Swiss-Prot record:
Domain bHLH residues, every copy: 61-113
Region (Disordered): 24-46
InterPro entries the record matches: bHLH_dom, E-box_TF_Regulators, HLH_DNA-bd_sf
GO annotation terms (biological process): cell differentiation; developmental process; negative regulation of hematopoietic stem cell differentiation; positive regulation of stem cell differentiation; positive regulation of transcription by RNA polymerase II; regulation of transcription by RNA polymerase II; stem cell population maintenance
Role noted for this protein: Early transcription factor that plays a key role in somitogenesis, paraxial mesoderm development and regulation of stem cell pluripotency. Essential for the mesenchymal to epithelial transition associated with somite formation. Required for somite morphogenesis, thereby regulating patterning of the axial skeleton and skeletal muscles. Also plays a key role in regulation of stem cell pluripotency. Promotes pluripotency exit of embryonic stem cells (ESCs) by priming ESCs for differentiation.
Protein name as annotated: Transcription factor 15
Keyword DNA-binding belongs to the record: yes
PANTHER family: BASIC HELIX-LOOP-HELIX TRANSCRIPTION FACTOR, TWIST, TRANSCRIPTION FACTOR 15
MF-aspect GO terms: DNA-binding transcription factor activity, RNA polymerase II-specific; E-box binding; protein dimerization activity; RNA polymerase II transcription regulatory region sequence-specific DNA binding
Annotated GO CC locations: nucleus
Gene giving rise to this polypeptide: TCF15
CDD domains named among the record's database cross-references: bHLH_TS_TCF15_paraxis
Domain of life, source organism: Eukaryota
Length: 183
């Protein structure tokens, strides 16, 4: 997946009918003979002219401030991952998930919950992702099996489905063989 960063376009290009400056401001900016100061830029010009101290103590303080900001950011991210881990069902319950596992399971769980919303919890096998993949009749009609969510897969491996699955085995992309009942 490629992402492209686009530079913002000037407002005058996007909205040619709208002027950026009022007529008074345009007249002021066009007059080169004006020696007046409007007060908006005096402080900024004065600040630019003041040389900055770049001594070793200033550099150390800047580095310490940057380190403190990074620690706060890292702590915030870790707190968010901890909160997300508490919302994702895992087996065993006390299993510690890495960050990438947490993100992958969260994505899978969201897909599972979306299937539950679309198909309802009343699926006869308790696994809405199988119904979404193979249709309500359960026949494949020559279709390739697609990936299923981790939660239906886990339920399937535990034998959580209510049907007798017999010996019908299908290979799901990137996953060990699954037993899926055909009607």
């Amino acid at each position: 997946m490629a992402f492209t960063m686009l530079r913002p376009m000037a407002a005058r290009v996007l909205y040619p009918d709208i002027g950026m400056l009022s007529e008074d401001e345009e007249n002021r900016s066009e007059s080169d003979t004006s020696d007046q100061s409007y007060g908006c830029c005096e402080g900024a010009e004065a600040r630019r002219k003041v040389p900055r101290k770049t001594g070793p103590m200033v550099m150390v303080k800047q580095r310490q401030a940057a380190n403190a900001r990074e620690r706060d950011r890292t702590q915030s991210v870790n707190t968010a991952f901890t909160a997300l881990r508490t919302l994702i069902p895992t087996e065993p319950v006390d299993r510690k998930l890495s960050k990438i596992e947490t993100l992958r399971l969260a994505s899978s769980y969201i897909a599972h919950l979306a299937n539950v919303l679309l198909l309802g919890e009343g699926c006869e096998d308790g696994q809405p992702c199988f119904s979404a993949i193979y249709g309500a009749k359960g026949d494949l009609d020559g279709r390739q099996p697609r990936s299923i969510c981790t939660f239906c897969l886990s339920n399937q491996r535990k034998g959580g489905g209510r049907r007798d699955l017999g010996g019908n085995c299908l290979k799901v992309r990137g996953v060990t063989p699954l037993r899926v009942a055909r009607r």
